[in-house]
From Swiss-Prot:
Methyltransferase recorded as keyword: no
Keyword Nucleus: no
GO molecular function (one): metal ion binding
Organism: Pongo abelii (Sumatran orangutan)
Protein name: 5'-3' exonuclease PLD3
Compartments where found: Endoplasmic reticulum membrane; Lysosome lumen; Early endosome membrane; Late endosome membrane
Residues flagged as site, Cleavage: 71-72
Protein family membership: Belongs to the phospholipase D family.
Bilayer-crossing regions: 39-59
Post-translational modification: N-glycosylated. Proteolytically processed to a soluble form that is stable within endosomes and lysosomes. During transport through the secretory pathway becomes proteolysed by cysteine proteases, thereby releasing a stable soluble lysosomal lumenal polypeptide, whereas the transmembrane-bound fragment is rapidly degraded. Its transport route to lysosomes involves ubiquitination and the ESCRT complex.
Main location group: endoplasmic reticulum
Topological type in the membrane: Single-pass type II membrane protein
Gene that this sequence comes from: PLD3
Length: 490
């Protein structure tokens, strides 16, 4: 039971009147305070929003490359990558004393086609895989025709086949591409003439984003049996294959009607792997560093090393030797009018020989379509070999012999290689060594640094020395009569 409580109101002493502000001044002060708070809030939101916007723009332009500090590398690739050098040796070209026996390009291509399960992306210059394309009746075209037949079987089996090809500037056979379209393949023509005043000169395949071929061989039956070619097939190397797919995706985008080169490529095309941060891979059981370069520079999204920069880096880092095998060598912009001198590579080779004492060997192709002006530039390089300066540069011309029937095959019987090897690095590309191929024309290269003997680098060195020491290599002062009419540079 609660006790009965009595409540009594407390008497609060009266306060003395204070000096109060007039009501209009109080309201003015409150309004000013409220306005100041709103201004402060707006300023804070503006700063935060600006910071968020700049961060987004930063990431959009540079992708996630800048998540890595200057001394950090992307995570290594743990795929068991296997690299195999493949060659096309023209019929009748024999190396009786050579110990190197590499798989043929056609064997490699047919093997890749047989193993394709989900996708095949091909970047190509042109397509002439059959006798009908070249108006010939050559038995040696059989290998190219078989490649085309196998390509036509893929799309009906559920393989997504995409082909990016250079848009021709004039009449060019289209029967192969039409046959592939009818089989279910997708084809896009890239108008490099409109985009950069060049062509799509790239030659690579990507299979299931796991395996790839990259090299000098075109989609041409002659590239399998009548032209000397070199390339590399990478098996079980999805890290590199996916990165090569990014280069293909850029071509695929540019193959759309009305497309243009973006001023800034979207992040989708960016790469983490380049000259500064190459991919760490296990290649043929040995640690290696690798990355893919591309040309021309406008086709290089954030992170992608331009092809010329990659090539010059190999030259500049050589300390013992530089061996180069390439079809054309011209320190000019040969397809520009008027012609321009373009000494970027030439300067690098001369500097390597003169300043660092590097042994330089150039094996340049010579055939009926060689640019005559090459001879003067090659003689200039060879003239640096001198006992007083101790510069050691040698130049030879590689001539593929042809009998009467072989000589009638159009645009055949030539060494079409495009590679370089040093004591440190391997460079396998798709471009000739003259200016326009790096400034206007689309090309791709694979760069690998690997220590030790028995790796990709030493295998490529062995191929170069086999060719250099062969009876098909000739000094610049060789009599033209000794090689017949096959060479325009003697």
């Amino acid at each position: 039971m609660k006790p009965k409580l009595m409540y009594q109101e407390l008497k609060v002493p009266a306060e003395e009147p204070a000096n109060e502000l007039p009501m209009n001044e109080i309201e003015a002060w409150k309004a000013a305070e409220k306005k100041a708070r709103w201004v402060l809030l707006v300023l804070i939101l503006a700063v935060v929003g600006f910071g968020a916007l700049m961060t987004q723009l930063f990431l959009w332009e540079y992708g996630d490359l800048h998540l890595f500090g200057p001394n950090q590398r992307p995570a290594p690739c743990y795929d068991p990558c296997e690299a195999v050098l493949v060659e096309s040796i023209p019929e009748g070209l024999d190396f009786p004393n050579a110990s190197t026996g590499n798989p043929s390009t056609s064997q490699a291509w047919l093997g890749l086609l047989a193993g394709a399960h989900s996708s095949l992306d091909i970047a190509s210059f042109y397509w002439t895989l059959t006798n009908n394309d070249t108006h010939t009746q050559e038995p040696s075209a059989q290998q190219g025709e078989e490649v085309l037949r196998q390509l036509q079987t893929l799309a009906p089996k559920g393989v997504n086949v995409r082909i990016a090809v250079s848009k021709p500037n004039g009449p060019q056979p289209q029967a192969d591409l039409q046959a592939l379209l009818q089989s279910g393949a997708q084809v896009r023509m890239v108008d490099m003439q409109k985009l950069t005043h060049g062509v799509l000169h790239t030659k690579f395949w990507v299979v299931d984003q796991t395996h790839f071929y990259l090299g000098s061989a075109n989609m041409d039956w002659r590239s399998l049996t009548q032209v000397k070619e070199l390339g590399v097939v990478m098996y079980n190397c999805s890290c590199l294959a996916r990165d090569l797919t990014k280069i293909f995706e850029a071509y695929w985008f540019l193959g759309q009607a009305g497309s243009s080169i973006p001023s800034t490529w979207p992040r989708f095309y960016d790469t983490r792997y380049n000259q500064e941060t190459p991919m760490e891979i296990c290649l043929n059981g040995t640690p290696a560093l690798a990355y893919l370069a591309s040309a021309p520079p406008p086709l290089c999204p954030s992170g992608r090393t331009p092809d010329l920069k990659a090539l010059l880096n190999v030259v500049d880092n050589a300390r013992s030797f530089i061996y180069v095998a390439v079809m054309n060598y011209l320190p000019t912009l040969e397809f520009s009018h008027p012609h321009r001198f373009w000494p970027a590579i030439d300067d690098g080779l001369r500097r390597a020989a003169y300043e660092r004492g590097v042994k330089v060997r150039l094996l340049i192709s010579c055939w009926g379509h060689s640019e005559p002006s090459m001879r003067a530039f090659l003689l200039s390089l060879a003239a640096l070999r001198d006992n007083h300066t101790h510069s050691d540069i040698q130049v030879k011309l590689f001539v593929v012999p042809a009998d009467e029937a072989q000589a009638r095959i159009p645009y055949a019987r030539v060494n079409h290689n495009k590679y370089m090897v040093t004591e440190r690095a391997t460079y396998i590309g798709t471009s000739n060594w003259s200016g326009n191929y790096f400034t206007e024309t689309a090309g791709t290269s694979l760069l690998v640094t690997q220590n030790g003997r028995g790796g990709l680098r030493s295998q490529l060195e062995a191929i170069f020395l086999r060719d250099w020491d062969s009876p098909y290599s000739h000094d610049l002062d060789t009599s033209a009569d000794s090689v017949g009419n096959a060479c325009r540079l003697l």
